[in-house]
Amino acid sequence: EFTAQEWSKICDKKIWYNAVDEAHDLIDRDVKMNIQGYDLDGDMVKCAMENARAAGVEQHIHFQQRDVKDLRNPKKYGFIITNPPYGERLEEKEALPELYRTIGESYRSLDDWSMFLITSYTDAEKYIGRKADRNRKIYNGMIKSYFYQFMGPKPPKRRREEA
């Protein structure tokens, strides 16, 4: 849903509904996906599984309780999307340098991958060991945060098979 759908003086609602129907018709449901979700906290893994089930995408995601230091993948290219702890509690704050250092080490072991990270931790780049290619200020609720984008190389284009 988009707020602009309610702007009746700009656009007739029927146009919005037609656009939504067209977008749904264009969804390619046969795309092969390899989505993996990890968290050290088992309760967070269960929560993520419940959210995926509610969204109807549970069958496309492999969930596992795992430490970021154990992040490995044999695929040459991929994406890491993460929202690690921000250090809002004092005991977490003390652990952040080591956590972000570990995130950086795990990311570097995946040579050709990209990483997208949301955090309010202002020293994230320092401890990851790399300056982000892009950094956008965002808000996660009321918490001023940053969306760091660490870009890996683009994979080579695949040739389209002749029909």
Q: Model-predicted segments: where are they?
A:
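Conserved S-adenosyl-L-methionine
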Residues: 1-72, 88-89, 95
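C-terminal catalytic and target-recognition region of SAM-dependent MTase-like enzymes
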Residues: 67-70, 74-163
